[in-house]
Regions:
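P-loop NTP-binding module
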Residues: 1-185
Length: 185
């Protein structure tokens, strides 16, 4: 289940094309006591994938996240679903992100290629450490995969992987040619 906890600037509802989003109960309804958990979980178009969206912007999201209902929601979701993935606001931008991370087993830090500074990344690592959240990894987002810089670094791997038969070079062809029982080179 994906839980959209970016209560100030959510983009999940638009990406999932939820119709009449502003009229449906969402995470804010649950946190404010207006809905039960079952009322704010929606099926997605992906089999066995669900979402708890934030479809309406909230005035005081920090207070709602500090309430015990949020921690209870995460506990109940963890009992029901194999994975609970939380989309939070960026670390360093609002206190919510570190607060949310403190309730998680781990975090994957998403950084935008060419825009996120090293100092902000380092600060994010420190924030996760301070709240006791394990850094699971870093996801590089919007990386340029064409052009000279990309080819300079990654282009050499075609030659390297050819010896392992990953679709490059002639490894597969040599193995097929020697199928008569004679050893290949």
């Amino acid at each position: 289940v994906l839980v959209d906890v970016d209560l100030r600037k959510s983009v999940i509802k638009d990406r999932h094309h939820i119709k009449d989003a502003d009229k449906l109960p969402d995470l804010g309804y649950f946190l404010s006591g207006q809905s039960e958990m079952e009322d704010v979980i929606y099926e997605t178009q992906v089999e066995n994938a669900y979402i708890v969206p934030c479809m309406n912007l909230l005035e005081n999201p920090s207070a709602l996240l500090e309430d015990a209902r949020f921690a209870e929601l995460l506990d109940k979701l963890a009992e029901t679903y194999r994975y609970v993935i939380i989309d939070s606001p960026p670390l360093g931008s609002v206190a919510d992100a570190a607060q949310i991370a403190s309730l998680c087993d781990g975090a994957a830090l998403v950084v935008r290629a060419g825009e996120t500074s090293r100092s902000l990344i380092k600060q994010s690592f420190q924030q996760l450490d301070q709240v006791g959240c394990t850094l699971l990894g870093v996801i590089l987002n919007r990386a340029q995969t064409t052009g000279r810089a990309y080819k300079k670094y990654y282009g050499k791997y075609g030659k390297y992987y050819s010896q392992y038969g990953y679709g490059y070079g002639t490894y597969g062809k040599e193995a097929a040619a020697s199928s008569d029982g004679t050893p290949s080179k």
